[in-house]
From Swiss-Prot:
This is Apelin receptor. The gene is aplnr. Disulfide bonds join 28-288, 110-187. The lineage of its organism: Eukaryota, Metazoa, Chordata, Craniata, Vertebrata. Its main location: membrane. It is a multi-pass membrane protein.
């Protein structure tokens, strides 16, 4: 496929932009997609298997722990739900790529799958932002934030997250469609119903800003501000942390890890998209070789973003003793949990171990 024909059809991308020659840019050399046809489907299926199983376990564990669920757990469960909604579309995109960007599934699935991809992106970053805000309230305003962290407030915030995410992703549902190009049917952005050819670049640019600003930059700025305040608070009281505050600090480390990994996974994608946007609008004048590099790197930057959807459950398992304990407890691995506790503190009596098992599986 030639570079000047490369469009948002080439990946299940978070997708409001286009690498086409309709921008008035000179035609460039061809880009060889043979490696992508073979490599990307395998990668998609690995993410699908890990994401489906890992996020499924998270959702089940959070659901089973309802009586003692932390406010953070509710956001974590919804983060897993957003990731799960995305990874179930990956077999379709794997098939699409393996067939040389040929979409055999019809217009409805083209629209729905693209919509779920964008819905995941927005819902994930908004859940992480709310997690960060929840930790900010719990640590910086622990005495005065009870009402804001109540169950009803959390449910309202989740409703706003999903509604706002659904609205921001809606252009993908409207604009994505199938079209025939040569021997292939591709799933692509179609602006013919809303714009003339001359104004398509403005739509692409506007939608690109829509994904980058509320979908990455603004949430990342808010999370950075929250953690600056949290860092100041924790530093001031580091020597006098009570047991409850130590638990908050452990949970804080987990959430910071989630945010950092999210930023690392998404940053290359947004950098490439921003460079393309600036080139498209005439703020940059990229050579053909540079355009080809951007085009070639884009599917792999998108894949790095996809990794985030299957990494989170493994981060919980690695960093959060409480989550591991809940998994052991709810899936019936009580002997394994007892062994884990025995290694941690061999002096515990049998009765204490039994109590600790239940405590780890249900409490903060």
């Amino acid at each position: 496929m030639a570079t000047d024909e490369f469009s948002s059809s080439t990946t299940p991308s978070y997708d409001y932009y286009d690498y086409t020659n309709e921008s008035g840019l000179p035609p460039c050399d061809e880009t060889d997609w043979d490696l992508s046809y073979s490599l990307l489907p395998v990668f998609y299926m690995i993410v699908f298997v890990l994401g489906l199983s890992g996020n499924g376990v998270v959702i089940f564990t959070v659901w089973k722990a309802k009586p003692k669920r932390r406010s953070a757990d509710t956001y974590i469960g919804n983060l897993a739900l957003a990731d799960l909604a995305f990874v179930v579309t990956l077999p379709l995109w794997a098939t699409y790529t393996a067939l040389g960007f040929h979409w055999p599934f019809g217009s409805a699935l083209c629209k729905l799958s693209s919509y779920l991809v964008l819905l995941n992106m927005f819902a994930s970053v908004f859940c992480l932002t709310c997690l960060s805000f929840d930790r900010y309230l719990a640590i910086v305003h622990s005495l005065s934030s009870a009402k804001l962290r109540s169950r009803s407030s959390i449910l309202v915030s989740l409703a706003v997250i999903w509604l706002f995410s659904g609205l921001l992703a809606l252009p993908s549902l409207i604009l994505r469609d199938t079209r025939v190009e040569g021997n292939n049917t591709i799933c692509d952005l179609d602006f013919s119903g809303v714009s003339s050819k001359e104004n398509e670049n403005f739509w692409i640019g506007g939608l690109s800003i829509l994904t980058t600003v509320p979908g990455f930059l603004l949430p990342l700025l808010l999370m950075t501000i929250f953690y600056c305040f949290i860092g100041g608070k924790v530093t001031m009281h580091f020597q006098n942390l009570k047991k409850e505050e130590q638990k908050k600090k452990r949970l804080l480390k987990i959430i910071i890890t989630l945010v950092v990994v999210f930023a690392i996974c998404w940053l290359p994608f947004h950098i490439l998209k921003t460079i393309h946007f600036l080139d498209l609008m005439g703020f940059l004048e990229l050579s053909c070789s540079t355009q080809n590099i951007i085009v070639s790197l884009h599917p792999y930057a998108t894949c790095l973003a996809y990794i985030n959807s299957c990494l989170n459950p493994f981060l919980y398992a690695f960093f959060d003793l409480r989550f591991r304990s809940q998994c052991f407890f709810f899936f019936g691995f009580k002997k394994a949990l007892q062994g884990h506790l025995s290694n941690t503190s061999s002096s515990l009596s049998a009765q204490t171990q039994k109590s600790e098992i239940h405590s780890l599986a249900t409490k903060v």
